[in-house]
From Swiss-Prot:
Part of the 50S ribosomal subunit. InterPro entries: Ribosomal_uL6-like, Ribosomal_uL6-like_a/b-dom_sf, Ribosomal_uL6_a/b-dom, Ribosomal_uL6_bac-type, Ribosomal_uL6_CS. GO terms for biological process: cytoplasmic translation. The keyword rRNA-binding applies. GO terms for cellular component: cytosolic large ribosomal subunit. One of its GO terms (molecular function) is structural constituent of ribosome. This is Large ribosomal subunit protein uL6. It comes from the Bacteria. PROSITE patterns: RIBOSOMAL_L6_1 (PS00525).
């Protein structure tokens, strides 16, 4: 069993935190975020840190308070540093381009895929085969990166498709004659 929830989340200088009921709000140099903690978890802000504890001694409460602590730590990291996911596009003729608030992807289909960039997310295309997804909400950054990857996941034979830059693609050998 993990003991992640026992450590308090320290709030660095330059970040203001407030706890109102079950809602934790963080405001920092990059923006502001909030997270609603489950009712089975107690949340307190004292001595410059946020502490979480299970309200009951149930397995569900034990699991939820570790999750709540990790989510609050992500709020702090998001409003101070932010989050970034890098995607790589591999394949002949596969490329990406920005058109205002839309991402245009040429992924081998008969048409280009147009992806509307959601609010709070910044996408940059340093090269036609690289996409950087940046934002302060880790959930949103991961979701956007996963949605872009899902348009053409990497295939195991040639490795063509959209993949995370740190992802390893298990390659298969083709059929033998």
């Amino acid at each position: 069993m993990s003991r992640v929830g026992k450590k308090p989340v320290t709030v660095p200088s330059g970040v203001t935190a407030s706890v109102e009921g079950q809602t934790v709000k963080m405001k920092g140099p990059k923006g502001q975020l909030h997270f609603v903690v489950h009712d089975d978890v107690d949340v307190k802000f004292e001595d410059g840190s946020v502490k979480v504890a299970p309200r009951f001694e149930t397995n569900r409460a034990q699991a939820l308070y570790g999750t709540a602590r990790a989510q609050i730590a992500n709020l702090v990291e998001g409003v101070t540093k932010g989050f970034e996911k890098k995607l790589e596009i591999t394949g002949v003729g596969y490329r990406a381009a920005l058109q205002g608030k839309k991402l245009q992807l040429a992924l081998g289909y008969s048409h280009d895929v147009i992806y509307d960039i959601p609010e709070g997310i910044t996408i940059t295309v340093p090269k036609p085969t690289e996409i950087n997804v940046v934002g302060i909400d880790s959930q949103k950054v991961g979701q956007v990166a996963a949605e872009i990857r899902d348009y053409r996941p990497p295939e195991p034979y040639k490795g063509k498709g959209v993949r995370y830059s740190d992802e390893f693609i298990f390659r298969k050998e083709g059929k033998k004659k």
